[in-house]
């Protein structure tokens, strides 16, 4: 966490020079305080702001925050006790909280909220509004905000009293949890609530839930204090969290993540997650490999290519070029031209990869996947003996390669050498696929597990469900090849697949939606990234309409995921179609002549994009700076709806607005994950993920003018 704080301080130093026209948003950052910061082990029972400095209390005494450390003041902490109130009815039960509001004392009890009258008499408050009427239970939190409004937290939810009228909130309105422990006001009417399972901030009727290790050292919150800068100091049963909310711009956030990738995620030009030797400690990071180094490097390269197209920054061009040549190396190192490796590592790599991916490993996997490929070694030696490369390459890798090659060719490749290099590698891969009957063929002479794009595969028991996606991908690869190389043979091959094998018809259903086990989230990446090349380079107006239908079919299923990358890809391609219509590209009366009404109906229907970019904006702004993979459990929340789809796995759902929960409240730190998974774990604190998670959707959206900069 210290590294994140340091980087944030650099960003905040430069934020004073933000240009007036740049969009500014608030970025939350959590710093976990424990033994290394001077606090005792265990529970922090109280936190107060004294002379605008935090003071924490535990069973070991009091500790003051001085010069970024907790220092004991050698005073013993006193237990928190509530005063005795005379006259409170016995049926009210135990007093749990109290506040003085407008010259009146209010107490929260086990069985109600009470207001003191004259002569030690008490009146029970029964809050109501247009939606609810409550006899409150377990009123454990009371506070008054900076706008002089009374707030409570109770079993039923939370309430706010303003000018004599109540406004009540439950899970339907956004309250995430209701076993309250405390409340504390901030500035501009903002209020924090602590619960037995996390904390949340209410800001202008918007709820921000802060729970799990990304935000808190322990979910049981004992106390909260807000300082004059708006920083929340949250005391828990296992340490303290400091949550800072600071102004930031998109470009500052991009600079932060580019620095993060370059410092901790660059392995010989390949980009992926890293490993943490010590849980949650990014200072113990170690370079790692993934199954899809090529795809992830391509995505980082695409981010830098879009950045270069926007800014002409030489650094962006350098990083985009480095990514391209890393991808080309993956293709050049293998057993025959055009077969891309998944991964390249030096022979002295710190993990015994072939022992890990042994024959026994293959046998175990075949029990769950009968079509798992039994190949050994999975990391053969390079010809020069200096490297190992991972085989059994999948369609994921191809999707990443082709996605980037088109973008690189169009936006970055300026010299003859660069243009010839991208032309050659695209030709090599595409020729390999054609030569082997539209299959990726490994060094054993057999197709890889996920590398078949041929008609026989589509019409088989093991490939029928991949038909739409893989047919569309193959047509996309051929479109990219035709565009980049200028060779007409690739269009001729594509025409044969369309006319003789109906690949263009299959492509209209480019993604499986049901049963749920077939709707895997990474297929959304493969589908949308491949559609990007297919649509951008398609010259035939009838097929443009067909592929626009395919895009909408693929998009609607994931349109509520709050995935800024998928939103951006859809928005870019839908905008491309709109532009084509405006340019007069389509002559409806000449298209689909068997039914001359069809083309116009499709153009009218799909002319406007269905993207609501509010959710893309929300996600880009709320992507956390901390991309450690945490165990994030949201199954207990009051503001969720479980997915009732037949055959759906347990623990799937979304917010009560029917959209995925906000990005910083779920364990979603990769671009190809399902945002409706309510309990997610991406490494359990032993991996940090690369900043491509922000960089690619941001620069893609900026390049295609989908967000306000």
Positions of PLM-derived features:
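Long, well-ordered core segments of solenoidal/helical folds
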Residues: 252-279, 320-335, 424-442, 489-510, ...
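Extended ligand-binding groove/face enriched in aromatic
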Residues: 274-276, 280, 318-466
């Amino acid at each position: 966490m210290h590294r994140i704080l340091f980087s944030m301080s650099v960003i905040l130093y430069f934020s004073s020079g933000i240009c007036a026209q740049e969009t500014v948003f608030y970025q939350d950052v959590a710093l976990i305080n424990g033994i290394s910061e001077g606090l005792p082990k265990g529970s922090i029972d109280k936190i107060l702001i004294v002379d605008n400095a935090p003071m924490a209390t535990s069973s070991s005494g009091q500790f003051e925050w001085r010069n970024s450390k907790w220092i004991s003041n050698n005073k013993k902490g006193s237990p928190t006790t509530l005063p005795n109130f005379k006259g409170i009815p016995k049926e009210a039960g135990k007093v749990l909280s109290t506040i003085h509001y407008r010259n009146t004392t209010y107490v929260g009890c086990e069985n109600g909220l009470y207001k003191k009258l004259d002569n030690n008499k008490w009146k029970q408050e029964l809050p109501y509004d247009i939606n609810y009427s409550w006899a409150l239970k377990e009123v454990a939190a009371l506070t008054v905000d900076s706008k002089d409004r009374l707030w409570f937290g109770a079993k039923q939810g939370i309430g706010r009293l303003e000018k004599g009228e109540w406004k009540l909130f439950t899970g339907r309105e956004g309250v995430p949890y209701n076993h309250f422990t405390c409340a504390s006001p901030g500035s501009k009417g903002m209020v924090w609530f602590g619960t037995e399972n996390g904390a949340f901030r209410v800001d202008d009727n918007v709820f921000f839930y802060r729970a799990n290790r990304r935000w808190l050292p322990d979910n049981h919150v004992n106390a909260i204090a807000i300082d004059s800068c708006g920083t929340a100091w949250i005391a828990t049963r296992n340490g303290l969290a400091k949550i800072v909310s600071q102004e930031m711009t998109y470009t500052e956030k991009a600079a932060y993540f580019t620095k993060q990738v370059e410092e901790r995620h660059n392995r010989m030009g390949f980009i992926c997650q890293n490993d943490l030797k010590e849980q949650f400690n990014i200072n113990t990071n170690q370079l790692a490999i993934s199954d899809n180094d090529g795809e992830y490097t391509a995505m980082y390269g695409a981010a830098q290519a879009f950045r270069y197209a926007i800014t002409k920054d030489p650094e962006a061009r350098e990083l985009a070029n480095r990514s391209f040549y890393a991808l080309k190396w993956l293709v050049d190192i293998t057993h025959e031209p055009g077969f891309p490796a998944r991964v390249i590592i030096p022979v002295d790599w710190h993990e015994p990869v072939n022992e890990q991916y042994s024959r026994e490993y293959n046998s175990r996997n075949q029990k769950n996947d009968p079509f798992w490929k039994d190949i050994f070694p999975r990391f053969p030696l390079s010809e020069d003996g200096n490297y190992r490369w991972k085989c059994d390459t999948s369609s994921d890798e191809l999707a990443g390669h082709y996605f980037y090659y088109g973008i690189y060719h169009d936006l970055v490749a300026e010299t003859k050498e660069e243009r010839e290099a991208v032309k050659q590698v695209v030709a090599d891969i595409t020729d390999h696929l054609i030569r082997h009957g539209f299959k990726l063929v490994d060094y054993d002479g057999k197709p890889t597990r996920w590398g078949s794009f041929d008609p026989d595969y589509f019409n088989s028991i093991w490939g029928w469900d991949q038909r739409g996606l893989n047919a569309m991908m193959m047509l996309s690869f051929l479109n990219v090849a035709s565009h980049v190389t200028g060779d007409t043979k690739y269009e001729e091959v594509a025409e044969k697949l369309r006319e003789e094998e109906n690949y263009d018809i299959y492509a209209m259903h480019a993604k499986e939606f049901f049963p749920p086990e077939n709707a895997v989230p990474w297929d959304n990446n493969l589908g949308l990234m491949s559609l990007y090349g297919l649509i951008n380079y398609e010259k035939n107006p009838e097929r443009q309409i067909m592929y626009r239908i395919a895009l909408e079919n693929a998009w609607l299923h994931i349109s509520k995921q709050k995935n800024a990358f998928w939103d951006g890809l859809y928005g870019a391609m839908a905008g491309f179609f709109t532009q084509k219509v405006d340019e007069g590209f389509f002559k409806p009366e000449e298209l689909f002549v068997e039914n001359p009404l069809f083309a116009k109906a499709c153009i009218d229907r799909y002319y406007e994009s269905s993207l609501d970019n509010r959710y893309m904006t929300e996600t880009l702004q709320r992507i956390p700076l901390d991309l450690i993979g945490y165990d994030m459990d949201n199954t207990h929340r009051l503001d969720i709806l479980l997915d009732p789809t037949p055959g759906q796995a347990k623990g799937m759902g979304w917010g009560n607005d029917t959209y995925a929960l906000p990005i910083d409240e779920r364990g979603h730190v990769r671009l190809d994950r399902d945002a409706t998974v309510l309990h997610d774990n991406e490494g359990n604190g032993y991996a940090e993920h690369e900043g491509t998670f922000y960089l690619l959707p941001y620069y893609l959206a900026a390049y295609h003018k989908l967000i306000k900069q």
